[in-house]
């Protein structure tokens, strides 16, 4: 058993102890003031109801613990000259982080109107959770934050992502005991198996056991000390326990424990960096057990409050109906003795402010928490040199994501010295055809490596763990601290991080409008092994709905690309890696597929995002009878095959073929910056001709994006309609009416002059579908005429 026990408890001198306790009191005072007050910030007159906000919003319970940790981290940063940032997993303790950045001076530097005096304090208090003010959590508006902590579960993965390739950085990561019950958090403890002390920084997890969630005890606070200790030893940590409710001994124990943990981190790093990493180290962590709502009211209306769930939010909430609560609030706030903490102007006393680090060592002003400041452009090879040779459209085959993998291999190679590019994925890098990366780097692995293992090493730059949540959290932490990356995933299973994507998109949207927040590298997804080529794994693996989810977010931060072949995928990939402050979703196939555009045509097509394919159309100089649009690699294939059928049977039918790479082009320009104007949309799609649209995903998404268009009523969309099983590739499109025969049938139904004259052709199309079913049931594969089809014109 690992024994982690602190014997020494006299780390702080009497003067240090008194000053640190005073600093903590000041942070607690400011935190309570933010929740309750909009006037009389220093209680220079008796507190009255009109000084109190009419709507009381915020969370007190976790806040004193967050403040306690912050003041102790300040001391160790000063003593050891540490480069450290703070992640508050319980981000609902927002008043505490705002209070601490105000006390250290950072907040007023970022927001000069919140000055370091009584008037500034009044504004600080009033703005919190107030219309026109700031949110209640550790939101992007909070200096020093890379993690809002609104949706719980991601603190630890964000912390590790931040320290990868940041050898001097330490992230103090506070994990709430409620958050510790979430699935993503439980898995993310394993991130220590991927941390290389030679090249990476360190995470100091601080599990804050205050015992309660909103209305229930927490699991980890109620299990025995021995079981809790063994749990974290099993995770590979060396847990130190700091437990108490009495101020002086808890301060002393926390100080001694932090000194020990920092010393152990430095020793681990020194040994690895001088002798090389050999075995995975056992990193220290702290388990801090203090009362929920510490220093707050013991009881409210005769009911237990401190050290109980009732302190979670606002202990005194009925101020207007219970005047005695106003008096009790005043008593509570005066218990912090603000007259001993702030001078006559309302400025924090200099001797106390001196406890905070200076300049960029302040956790609120650390550049790593505003990663765009540190962001360096990737060194990019010329993607055009990776082009697939396409002498004639629709006649040669290539694996699009394998070509992309070759390009990413050389992006990785070009940036090895900068150490600012990583790949993440849930054990799918090779499956998704990014195997060429392993010619340059390996998978990160800090545990035992056997001779027969495949591409594992301690200095690998491909991060694989079978947890989409952890992959997403690592990448977000990496990007938020000023680096670049790509996440490849099976299309159906990216849904596991739907809500994580939500939170990151909200962060990007908000920070776009905060002047001091610098743009960061985009979060790039490759979604492959997609719905139309999951015929082998079956229905559970077939879901293209992530893009529906993505387009719900603000247009200013999301982009969705569906390149139809390898050269368009190369162009899109280059664009995504150069872009800033977006979420880019790229959907592409990994199987051998027909190639349509040479590199010059691909660049032009991707730059426009949507376009008429002249080589596939025959309406030059005249109005088309029908528009056939496609978006996605398989819909493109089936559309072109349908065009072939129609041209063979109706040589005089004028067909316009449109391909969409940038899905957001379909929206009006008033809704998305990439959207087409109505004039341009009508020019391409016509204002009145029938449109048969073959789409990669759920068909109603196209209707959502185009419902304001003049010709919307004539747009008929085919896509995935939740039909699937383990079958052949072509049968997948047949089951969803997206196949070439059904698309040709749709055209016949919608072109008036064909409706009643093409009955024989319609019957032939139906016969082909019957023939298809008979063939696959007998042979277990698609008909040769389907498998081997190429563009014949």
UniProtKB/Swiss-Prot annotation:
Query: Biological process GO terms, please?
Result: carbohydrate metabolic process
Report if keyword Lyase is assigned: yes
Cofactor requirements of the protein: thiamine diphosphate
Which molecular function GO terms apply here? aldehyde-lyase activity
Q: Which organism is it from?
A: Gloeobacter violaceus (strain ATCC 29082 / PCC 7421)
User: What is its EC class?
Assistant: lyase
Task: Tell me where on the tree of life, at the top rank, the source sits.
Answer: Bacteria
Q: What is this protein called?
A: Probable phosphoketolase
For the keyword Nuclease, the answer is no
The UniProt family comment states: Belongs to the XFP family.
Which UniProt keywords are listed? Lyase, Thiamine pyrophosphate
Question: What Gene3D superfamilies does the annotation carry?
Answer: 3.40.50.920, 3.40.50.970
State one Pfam family annotation: XFP_N
UniProt xrefs under InterPro entries: Phosphoketolase, THDP-binding, Transketo_C/PFOR_II, Xul5P/Fru6P_PKetolase, Xul5P/Fru6P_PKetolase_C, Xul5P/Fru6P_PKetolase_CS, Xul5P/Fru6P_PKetolase_N, Xul5P/Fru6P_PKetolase_ThDP_BS
